[in-house]
Amino acid sequence: MLLVGMLDSPYVRRAAVTGTLLGLEFEHRSVSVFRHMDEFRAINPLIKAPSLVTDDGTVISESLLIIQHFEDLSGRSLRPVEASVRMRDLSLTGIGIVAADKAVAIEYERKRPEGQRHAPWQERIVAQLHTALDLLDAAAGRGELTAGPDLLPSDIAAAIAWGFCRFVTPEFAPVERWPALDAQASACEALDVFKQWPIDRE
């Protein structure tokens, strides 16, 4: 299998970390949807990161579906078994994904010429990001987000979203405002599986 996309994408990185934790072997190729469009188009004409090329050449787009395929292949999931814990994990995973989505949206807005930026929209996505980070920080403070020993999807999503915020949009994510989330994410980043997939790998 081949996972395609840059690790500074929270979606690519979450898929890579999850696949590794599930014990799967796959190749990774750092191809940018911005700097290497022609190369990416040759792999997936949708130019969507991450993309997974399966062993039979099928291309799967969208990180959630790639993770679902990883679970199918491994015959297991990182999600908890107990119903109430599983539901909480789903909720927190969604919040982590929203945090990543809004941080990505902020970065995309900054790529626009200043005259084409819409201040009310920028304010909205920043507010959404901060709400998501507030919720994740509170969950980390309650011990609902951890760094293992058994990582859940919500732990991974939260840590990777925070890492992306600090790497790409640090001015919108000061550590002192969300210290519990920062501590949880820092503990995750110290794990071998996170070190295997560093956000700054070219």
Describe the function of each predicted region:
Residues 175-202:
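Long hydrophobic alpha-helical segments typical of transmembrane helices together
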Residues 67, 71, 90-93, 133, ...:
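Non-transmembrane alpha-helical segments in soluble domains
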Residues 1-119:
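GST-like domain detector, emphasizing the conserved glutathione-binding G-site
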Residues 52, 64, 129-137, 193:
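Aromatic-glycine hotspot motif
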Residues 2-3, 171-172, 196:
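Short, contiguous strand/loop micro-motifs
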Residues 96-184:
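GST-like fold's C-terminal all-alpha helical module
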